[in-house]
Structures are given as structure tokens and as C-alpha cells.
Amino acid sequence: MAFTLPELPYPHDALAPIMSRETLEFHHDKHHLAYVNNGNNALKGTEWEGKPLEEIVKGSFGKNAAVFNNAGQHYNHTHFWKWMKPKGGGKTPGEVEKALKDGFGSVDKAKEDLIQAGVTQFGSGWAWLTLKDGKLSATKTANGENPLVHGGKPILGVDVWEHSYYIDYRNRRPDYLKAFVENLVNWDYVAERYAAAVK
């Protein structure tokens, strides 16, 4: 099925001042839309045309850069918008809290490790809380890659491409990541992704 741009689950100004209307207008309305359009063009006539998104991401990795880069970024961003909410952050739901404590020792350590993964990702990419072999860990990937292509399941991801933070934070990526973790994360959606991942 063709890629389509999902609507934001909140108004463009709902995450301000942590993430501005201008950032979301560029990031969602222009960058994500470009991945959708370029992905649809790249898919034409390939073996992945009409396949589910996750299957396209896994199948095209290492085989077709044009398909993979756009499919990967479409997948990542489709979840990224849902991983945020107005007045996010706060308490983690029970099952996720237990999993974070099992994987990291504490919820605070999980947050610190996620931030560190994002800070140390050289150039464009993503930082993740990843479920692999029954355990949660903080990981990072370059460009449009995600844990799916490395045998893991993403339960939370944060975009560290400059277009995700440069309007609001300029070169202060660590400040953006801290603000994301403390004020934007939609832990209910993280819990939903975790429940699906452990099935």
C-alpha cells in the first residue's frame, strides 16, 4: 500500500515551547512529507510495492537504498509523532517502569542512557529504547535506520537529525534531548509499543 502522511495527533503549536510550531511545520509538513513522496516513487516496480511498511523496512535494508532510506524514515517519523504529547514526560506506566528497572537499574538511568545515545550519535540519526532478547537497552542508529533491521523492536525513539531541533535549540542537541525526555515523551504510547513487542 502507498505511504501516506499521518496527521499529527495534536495541533502544530501543542508542544510549544519545548518544540515550536515552526519546527513541526517544517519537520512534519515538509520533511516527513518528502519521505512519503520519495518513498512512493522509489517503491514503484519493486518487490516491496504494496507490502506493509515494517516488511518494506526490513526487506529493503542493504538492498535498495532509495526504498530503505525513505521507508525507514517514514516508519520512524510515524511513531515519533505518537511518542510525544503535550505536557508529556512524568510517571512511567507500571509494566514499562518494571522493564526499565530490569534493563537499566532505574528509570532515571534509562533516561540518562537514552539521552547519551542521542548525544553521541555522530551526525544524523536516532536514539532508541530497544527491546532485544527480552531486555531493554538504549541504542542509536545512523540516518534512517532503526532497531528493526538490527534484530530489535523500538519502544521509544527520538530523532537527532538537525531538522528536529535546530530551529528551537540551534546546536544544543543535549538540551533538546533532555527536554524531550522530561517534557514530551508519551509514556502511554511507549507502553503500547512495549506490550506489542513482548507478545
Regions found by a protein language model. Name each.
Residues 1-199:
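Feature for soluble, non-membrane regions of globular proteins
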